[in-house]
Swiss-Prot record:
Keywords: Cytoplasm, Glycosyltransferase, Purine salvage, Transferase. This is Adenine phosphoribosyltransferase. It is found in: Cytoplasm. It comes from Mycoplasma genitalium (strain ATCC 33530 / DSM 19775 / NCTC 10195 / G37). GO terms for molecular function: adenine binding; adenine phosphoribosyltransferase activity; AMP binding.
């Protein structure tokens, strides 16, 4: 394993029984406080995003925004934000999904999101953790409603035991930096 990946793995803190009994939580916030490490992560993700010729970066709140905003700046691609229900004004589309820790959540996007993103069609979904893939599936639905196409998925971490990768669109490439 490359030294940078070892440092990245060491920076991520583990908390047992959080937020629920029996859950192992991976805290990625130390990565953000280390500029060199955060830049390493962004560089890995940006190279992938450029290689797949994405036209826009789509990310969910909250931690997805951290990666998405930095990557939009680094790649010079438009950023499309996906919000939790009742956080956006205007005409919206929505999709429901289930999370690892709770059932039934809703994500929303503006109906003009892709138009404002230079009429982007080829979208990469970026988030911090791939767990059950519920969030990603909801974003896939939203993009389809807007005639967008998911051309890639990009995550810092995959939680393999939750089998989220198997639920991603089968013909869409993905970049995952760490697998736990």
């Amino acid at each position: 394993m490359d030294q940078n990946f070892k440092l990245l793995d060491q920076a991520i803190k583990r908390f047992e029984n959080f937020p629920n009994q029996g859950t192992l939580f991976y805290d990625i916030t130390p990565v953000f406080s280390n500029p060199q490490l955060f830049n390493f992560v962004l560089t890995q993700m940006a190279q992938f995003i450029k290689a797949i010729n994405a036209e826009a970066i789509v990310c969910p709140e909250a931690r997805g925004f951290i990666f998405g905003g930095a990557l939009a700046s680094k790649t010079q691609l438009p950023l499309v934000l996906v919000r939790k229900a009742n956080k956006l004004p205007g005409q919206l589309i929505s999709a429901s999904y289930d999370l690892e820790y709770r059932k039934h959540a809703v994500l929303e996007m503006s109906t003009t999101s892709l138009i404002q993103a230079n009429n982007a069609k080829r979208c990469v979904i970026v988030d911090d953790v791939l767990a059950t893939a519920g969030t990603v599936a909801a974003i896939d639905q939203l993009l389809k409603q807007l005639n967008g196409e998911t051309v890639g998925y990009c995550f810092l971490i995959e939680l393999k035991k939750l089998n989220g990768k198997a639920k991603l669109q089968p013909n869409v490439v993905s970049k995952i930096l760490l697998h736990y």
